[in-house]
Amino acid sequence: SMYLDNYLSRLNNESLETSVTEVSKQIFDNVKKFYNFKESATGLLFGNVQSGKTAQMLGAIARFADVGYKIFLLLTSDNVDLQRQTYLRTQSSLLDFNVLSEKDDIKFLQEGLRKPTVIVLKKNGRILKKWREILLSCQFCKGQFLMIFDDEGDNASLNTLVNKNRHSTINKNLDAIKDSASSCVYFEVTATPQSLILQSEVSGWHPNFVNYFKPGKGYLGGDFFYADPKPFCIKYTKENELDDVTAEDDNYCPEGLQESILYFLIECAHKKLKGETNCNFMIHPSIKTEIHSKFAI
């Protein structure tokens, strides 16, 4: 298991190494059970929000490369920064692979499949169509099995026009990419799987199997933040604070927001004293984007 062992050695986290080893084995066993190399199969890879799903995806890719799979697509949402971030992380994690970005079509055609190849693409109609044509036309792809890992698989991938008897652009292109290979395993990766589970059997998007990623030690998720009794770190503000902001000019900062910013600055100072640098503060005031402009810095 050269590829998986090399990937694990770069994680520098014993509990994550154990988790990735176990999860990738479970995914491998499910593929062996549900995939017959004649018809495509769909798997749901379900993990908690911000619980290390990317690390698990890369571990699964490494394990499948060890048994001879050669072509992997890793799909991100249609966001330039996210695609680049995923590409750079994959490149630094899978050093034994040929990791390609969206514009590396010439490199792909020149280098072929001497190494296992991961292509990191945005879910963008133009980009997906371009790579579908490349996969269809290249000689060394013929007869190869394709593995697709769709990060946030419930975002943009499904057919949003099904009730109008039409095909949405992204969904149509993804179907075409799946059909370009002799057969395909498609992994829908998400923390919010409801829409995927509700897909019809005939759609081709209903999962044949499900794998759940357990979060590692120290993970703080819904069980912590929505616990009863309320955890110490949760503070409730007045329910009408947003009304106060929208009624005043852009310089008005309500009491709850002021306190939140002060807590954040204290935490930043604490982390700096410990030699840590990464601090983020997020405000989600409304589902309406025009309200967000009042909070933008």
Where is each model-derived feature located?
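Short helix/loop capping segments that flank catalytic or ligand/cofactor-binding pockets
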Residues: 54, 83-84, 128-130, 157-158, ...
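Conserved RecA-like ASCE ATPase "motif II neighborhood" in helicase/translocase motors
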Residues: 101-149, 157-177
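Conserved Walker A/P-loop ATP-binding site and its immediately adjacent core
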Residues: 56, 69-94, 287
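Conserved pre-motif I regulatory segment
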Residues: 7-46
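Pre-Walker A (Motif I) flank of P-loop NTPase domains
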Residues: 38-45, 70-71, 115-117, 277-281
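Subunit-assembly interface segments of extracellular/virion macromolecular structures
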Residues: 45, 62, 66-78, 82, ...
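Motif I (Walker A/P-loop) of helicase-class P-loop NTPases
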Residues: 53-62
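Conserved P-loop NTPase catalytic core
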Residues: 116, 144-150, 154, 162-272, ...
